Amino acid sequence: MTILKANSLEKSFGRRKVVDGVTLEIDAGEIVGLLGPNGAGKTTTFRMICGMLTPDQGQVLLRDQDVTDWPMYIRARDGGMGYLPQQSSVFAKLTAEQNLIAMMELLNMPSDQQLTRCNELLEQFKISHVRKTRAGRLSGGERRRLELARCLVSRPEIIMLDEPFAGIDPVTVQSIQTIIRQLAREGISILITDHAAREILQITHRTYVVSDGRILCSGTADDIVRHPGVKEKYLGDIDLESTKWPKPVFTRLAPTGRNFTPTGVRADDL
């Protein structure tokens, strides 16, 4: 079941067309990558899908509802979309716990539900031991996990991850990959973009590669690394022999009460 679809997106800056007819879709519980060389239009495409930019042409649909003109905060509030920015977004002077509570208050979550939800997220992201630590004193990995936890406060149906592997060590990268897989098992759809192509291809069900403002290739990691155009313009001879690719299966979630509630989700069976 398709959760998000971008139809024929176009965007120009001055006389330069940066995105020229990009179409992509994401199913429920699916991890989808968005890759491409610098200047290819990948970031602009991602920002249009998030609601940070408005396309000149084309549509963005969330569960078949046109949200093209919705700003990011409305997509988060009413459309079930979460967003993890590339730059650190935590409140450095607040504790990890206070960061989560602040987001809950911003979303008008009932006060009697806040502590329970906070405890769930701290445990899920393995940061309970730093709940009383100021965010500015957390390690890079702890801070990234806190940012992911904040992204899930509202129980989104799809999350957009912008450079989640930037500035963290290999062990933490593996930890974040594990979390992303778990989120997919829980039925959350994920669109992820990063310069770390290998790490992206290790966890995605499908990936789109953008070049010169258009989709150059889409498919599994194996499809991507074998595509001659992708090799020439982007990946070169990247070695992914040891990579395991998640295999989607279908499961079912309880209703969330939102207009965009799924009747079925896809999750991986790792």
Feature annotation, model-predicted:
Residues C50:
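Helix-to-loop junction immediately C-terminal to a conserved catalytic motif
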Residues I101, D112-V130, T178-R181:
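Conserved ABC ATPase "signature" region
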Residues R134-L138:
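Conserved ABC ATPase signature
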Residues L35-P37:
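The feature captures the beta-strand-to-loop junction immediately N-terminal to the Walker
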Residues R155:
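Conserved catalytic motifs of ABC-family nucleotide-binding domains
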Residues D66-G82, Q87, S111-L115, V225-P228:
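ABC ATPase NBD coupling module
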